[in-house]
């Protein structure tokens, strides 16, 4: 649960700390806007991971690719954004495809690093579906590298997390990587 008042006070202190007049017309409502944004994010992080067991005989790879997302780098509080690809091989359970999209959104809507985001998505799919295997790939641009530091806009950082057949069977891994590139 978030503490809206602490967020408001923290943003006021931050703005004053960088020399802004917190009574200025364009800024005076910013602390409340930021708190409201984080409240909205918190609401989106909760969802029901509905399973469908009536398709228990399906045993080929299921992929949802090019899932757009945005997150916040926990080191600099700057956005990173891109797309995620999720695949799994069912073991008697499948989920509504939107649940994979919601999983990406839910895990991304908090201060995060891309490596952990990739692992958390794979963890949830593994826990909820108990599949034969899971593959997650995330491609993202980090504004903390584009706007500051090395100032390298347009880069793409790629992370992956593989479980089960995706890790142990080279053909499954190759099929996954080939399909997400098509």
Curated annotation (Swiss-Prot):
Zn(2+) binds at residues 73, 76, 144. One of its GO terms (biological process) is tetrahydrofolate biosynthetic process. Belongs to the GTP cyclohydrolase I family. It comes from Hydrogenobaculum sp. (strain Y04AAS1). This is GTP cyclohydrolase 1. Homomer. The keyword Cell wall biogenesis/degradation does not apply. GO terms for cellular component: cytoplasm.
């Amino acid at each position: 649960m978030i503490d809206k008042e602490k967020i408001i006070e923290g943003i006021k202190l931050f703005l004053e700390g960088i020399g802004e007049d917190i009574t200025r017309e364009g800024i005076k409502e910013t602390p409340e806007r930021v708190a409201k944004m984080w409240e909205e994010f918190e609401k989106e992080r909760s969802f029901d991971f509905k399973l469908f067991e009536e398709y228990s005989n399906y045993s080929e790879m299921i992929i949802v690719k090019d899932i757009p997302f945005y997150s916040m780098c926990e080191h600099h509080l700057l956005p990173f954004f891109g797309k995620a690809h999720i695949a799994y091989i069912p073991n008697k359970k499948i989920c509504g495809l939107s649940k994979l999209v919601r999983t990406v959104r839910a895990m991304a809507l908090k201060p995060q690093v891309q490596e952990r985001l990739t692992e958390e998505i794979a963890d949830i799919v593994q826990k909820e579906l108990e599949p034969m295997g899971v593959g997650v790939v995330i491609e993202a641009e980090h504004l903390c590298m584009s706007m500051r530091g090395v100032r390298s806009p347009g880069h793409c950082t790629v992370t992956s997390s593989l479980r089960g057949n995706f890790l142990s069977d080279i053909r499954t891994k190759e099929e996954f990587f080939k399909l997400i590139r098509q």
